[in-house]
Every structure is written in structure tokens, then in C-alpha cells.
């Protein structure tokens, strides 16, 4: 026989060209055997940081998953497909909205996550789906398809940083002449929040609780969106340069909303100002460091409590990545309407992977299936199999 040494980071190349493989790290043999098996284990474990305990947890989970039947695992999850982030968002929404009518739709511009974050509570109060615009100058094909299928009487457009007036003209040209109402044109995320809140107050849309999040805490705010949808809760997104919240406090007081959740460290620093105004504040994920998992667990518990008894949720899972938010614009309505939550996993961090695995294993009875979101930025085949195995 011939032994060939291949130094490569391409797992596919190793699996395709070799019969056997050895994974050597820091001068020690970590694993050896069938090349395809070794490549898949390395693909789910190599190059990541984390504690020794987390590494062992992920290593064991990968081996367990790869020992299971592929068809059995694939029956426990699905992957959102599409040509781009807009089409994946809208396909996910249409799938989750199947069998429902929609007299109103919220169309969100995809230049900033703030549009979707503010729209989630608003859409929940209307019982409306969220459609991702897919472009600033015109609607994407997937957005047009979704709107034509839903055929709403009213379209609410959330357009901080876009879309442009051309899109409004396009909406108003539809044959059934929907009413088009827009928020946020040419203004900041906080002004967008204020405009949507004022409309909701005037039409008695809101519940008895509001949420305040900082613009920079985009992961926390997207994780929160299924719950704000389900609670019909207004969301105020603070500008990064925000110095006070007096205008927000005045608006909340005018609507007799006195329960305020301050989410993330960026919003929590204003607690004294809200408390001084006589509002009851609740701090969520206010500590330093990664607070995303804390937000996820809170939302998961809430959505489980309002879900159908004896029926586990289809849990949405995405990678924790700064560039991931365009893939997650419709998770608010998808999760809120179907009593589901969004989990984010940092695929470069073993501690994050181990925490997700442990949580799924301990809550397997509450999760029927997994729905992976994210396209090329999402989780790979090894991570998908590993997570699905934990509920199988």
C-alpha cells in the first residue's frame, strides 16, 4: 500500500481522496480510522476554543450522532433553503403561516435588523406575518410571491435605512389596491420604534408590557422577537448614542404601560431613569459577556408555557454570527405564531456548543423537531446531526 500525507483544512478532500486518516493535534493522535468518519469528527470539533469538559461533551456527541442512522436523524430536522437571505426568510414564513389568512402584512427592510425587531411585536398585535423586502429599490421575487399569495388588505412597511419610495409605489400599484402605511422613512431606529408605537397606541394594539433593547445587541433582540410577537409587546430600539429615554418614558406613560423589560447591557444602564418615572423595570441579560443563551432560555420557557399541551415545538436554530441577522428577519412571526423559539450557537466555541447540547438533551420532551436557519452562514452538517441526535 501507499501512505500519503495530506496537510489540508478541506475535510471533503480528505474524505474523498483517502481511505484512512489520522487527526494529529499538538503532537498527539486525537483520532484515526475511516477517512470520512475522521473528517466529519474534525469538522465538528477542530479549530474551536473552549474548556476541556466542553470539548469532551462535543466529541462524545459527534461520535454518538455519526453512529446513528442518517435517515433517522434527518427525520428530526429540516433546513431552510433558498437562493439568498430574503428568499430563505420568506420561505420560512410561508411554511410557518400555511393555512392561515393575513388581512395585514408587515414588510421589513433588510438594511438593518431594527426593522424586524420593531415589527415583531407590532405584527403579533395584528396577527400578521412578516415579509422580508429583499432589496431597497424594488421587492425581491420572494417578497412579491409572498405578498401575492397572502393578498393582504393592509401592508405596514418598516423602512429605517430603506426600502425606498420605489417600493412603496410598487406596493400601491397592486391590482387589489392594499392600503400601505410606512414607518421609519429617513429616521433612526428609535424614531422608527416611536412611530410604530404611536400607531399601535392609537389603535389599542398593545399589551401591558414593553421591551427596550439597544441597537448593538442585535442577537439578543432577534432572540427575543418570538416572545414580543406572542405578547403583542411594543419594542423600542435605542440608538447607540442614546443619552436619555425621556421621550420613550412619556410615550409609555401615555399608553398606561408600566411594565418595562430592559434587555441587554445597553438598555439596562437606563434602569434608574425608568424607575424614577414610576415604571416597573425588569432587567434581562444585563450582565457583561455573552448573554444570548440567557435570553434564549427565557423565551424558550415562555413559548413552552403557551404551546399546545403534549406537542413539542419546532425549535429554530441559527449560528451565532455577527453577519447572521439578515437570515433571521422573519423569526419573530415564525416563532411567535407557532409557539417556538430561536436558539443561537457559536460554532467556533465549544462551550457554546456544549451548552446547546446539554439544554436540548434536558428538554428533549419539549422539542419535536429542529429547523436550521442560515444558508452558508448557518451550521454545518456535523453540527446539525449532533444537535438532532440530542433530541432523537
For each predicted feature, which ranges?
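H-loop/switch region of ABC-family ATPase nucleotide-binding domains
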Residues: 8-9
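A short, surface-exposed alpha-helical micro-motif characterized by mixed small hydrophobic
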Residues: 14-16
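Conserved catalytic/dimer-interface elements of ABC ATPase nucleotide-binding domains
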Residues: 22
Amino acid at each position: 500500500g501507499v501512505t500519503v500525507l495530506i496537510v489540508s483544512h478541506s475535510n471533503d478532500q480528505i474524505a474523498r481522496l483517502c481511505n484512512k486518516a489520522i487527526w494529529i493535534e499538538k503532537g498527539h493522535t486525537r483520532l484515526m480510522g475511516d477517512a470520512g468518519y475522521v473528517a466529519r469528527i474534525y469538522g465538528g470539533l477542530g479549530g474551536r476554543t473552549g474548556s476541556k469538559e466542553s470539548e469532551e461533551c462535543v466529541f462524545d456527541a459527534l461520535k454518538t450522532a455519526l453512529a446513528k442512522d442518517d435517515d433517522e436523524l434527518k427525520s428530526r430536522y429540516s433546513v431552510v433553503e433558498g437562493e439568498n437571505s430574503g428568499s430563505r426568510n420568506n420561505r420560512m414564513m410561508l411554511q410557518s403561516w400555511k393555512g392561515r389568512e393575513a388581512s395585514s402584512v408587515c414588510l421589513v427592510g433588510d438594511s438593518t435588523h431594527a426593522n424586524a425587531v420593531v415589527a415583531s411585536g407590532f405584527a403579533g398585535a395584528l396577527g400578521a406575518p412578516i415579509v422580508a423586502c429583499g432589496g431597497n429599490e424594488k421587492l425581491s421575487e420572494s417578497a412579491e410571491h409572498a405578498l401575492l399569495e397572502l393578498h393582504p388588505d393592509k401592508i405596514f412597511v418598516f423602512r429605517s435605512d430603506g426600502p425606498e419610495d420605489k417600493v412603496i409605489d410598487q406596493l400601491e400599484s397592486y391590482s387589489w389596491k392594499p392600503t400601505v402605511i410606512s414607518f421609519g422613512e429617513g429616521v433612526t431606529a428609535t424614531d422608527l420604534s416611536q412611530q410604530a408605537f404611536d400607531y399601535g397606541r392609537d389603535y389599542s394594539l398593545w399589551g401591558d408590557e414593553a421591551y427596550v433593547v439597544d441597537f448593538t445587541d442585535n442577537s439578543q433582540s432577534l432572540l427575543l422577537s418570538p416572545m414580543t410577537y406572542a405578547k403583542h409587546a411594543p419594542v423600542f430600539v435605542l440608538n447607540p448614542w442614546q443619552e436619555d429615554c425621556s421621550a420613550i418614558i412619556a410615550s409609555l406613560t401615555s399608553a398606561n404601560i408600566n411594565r418595562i423589560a430592559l434587555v441587554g447591557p445597553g438598555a439596562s444602564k437606563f434602569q434608574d431613569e425608568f424607575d424614577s418615572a414610576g415604571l416597573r423595570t425588569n432587567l434581562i441579560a444585563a450582565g457583561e459577556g455573552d448573554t444570548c443563551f440567557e435570553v434564549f432560555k427565557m423565551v424558550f420557557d415562555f413559548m413552552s408555557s403557551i404551546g399546545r399541551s403534549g406537542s413539542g415545538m419546532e425549535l429554530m436554530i441559527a449560528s451565532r454570527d455577527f453577519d447572521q441577522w439578515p437570515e433571521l428577519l422573519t423569526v419573530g412571526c415564525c416563532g411567535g405564531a407557532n409557539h417556538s423559539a430561536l436558539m443561537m450557537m457559536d460554532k467556533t466555541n465549544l462551550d457554546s456548543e456544549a451548552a446547546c447540547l446539554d439544554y436540548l438533551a434536558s428538554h428533549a420532551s419539549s422539542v419535536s423537531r429542529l429547523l436550521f436557519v442560515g444558508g452558508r452562514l448557518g451550521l454545518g452538517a456535523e453540527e446539525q446531526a449532533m444537535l438532532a441526535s440530542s433530541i432523537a
